[in-house]
Amino acid sequence: FLNVVIHRLPKMMERDWHCQCAELREEEAPVYEKLTLATPRSRCPACGHAISALENIPVLSWLFLRGKCSACKAAISPRYPLVEMLTGLLSALAALVFGCTWAGAGALLLTWALIALTFIDADTQLLPDSITLPLLWGGLLFNLFGTYTDLASAVIGAMAGYLALWSVYWGFKLATGKEGMGYGDFKLLAALGGWLGWQVLPITILLSS
């Protein structure tokens, strides 16, 4: 499912922007085939072949098909099984560490969101609000019960995470006239602060720089 999110969400956002621009210009909005995270069924980008359930088994289908579309034999990017393997390994690690608990459920949600954001950012340099903002509020909700840190540390972490990169952004822009990062980075660091508390922000900034 994360491969679907990584591939489709930026396309859905781009279509929304095109429609909004057309509306502002009082032009006719472009017409697109309906695209959501659920529909239509995944297809080969080369020939449009609809991928069956047997061809959509994580990792195994890619290996069985030898990395090629069953219809047109076009190469299927190895990144698809990479995302699937990474998701499986990190999900198993989260389950092993936290077990079948409230904290385990949160760790899985955080893991999946960060994987999706990492690959979307690598492809498009976008960090969608539709992931970062629910992630922020999700972290605060989990820490309402002190799941990963106390609520005060989570709230301070969210505020400090946003303001830290906001300050760097504006300092850099005033000094150079250029934008060094996007607002999505502010929201993502705020979300991480909301999940893990302000104490993790220095090491997070250091590792991501």
What is each PLM-predicted segment?
Residues F1-N3, H7, S91, A95-L96, ...:
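Hydrophobic alpha-helical transmembrane segments
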Residues L2-H7, K11, A74, A95-G99, ...:
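Membrane-water interface at transmembrane helix exits
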Residues N3-R79:
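Membrane-proximal soluble regions of multi-pass membrane proteins
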Residues C44, T87, L93:
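Zn2+-dependent cytidine deaminase-like catalytic core
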Residues C47, G99-C100:
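Short, positively charged
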Residues S77-M85, D129:
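Select subsegments of transmembrane alpha-helices in polytopic membrane proteins
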Residues A103-S208:
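Functional transmembrane core segments of multi-pass inner-membrane proteins
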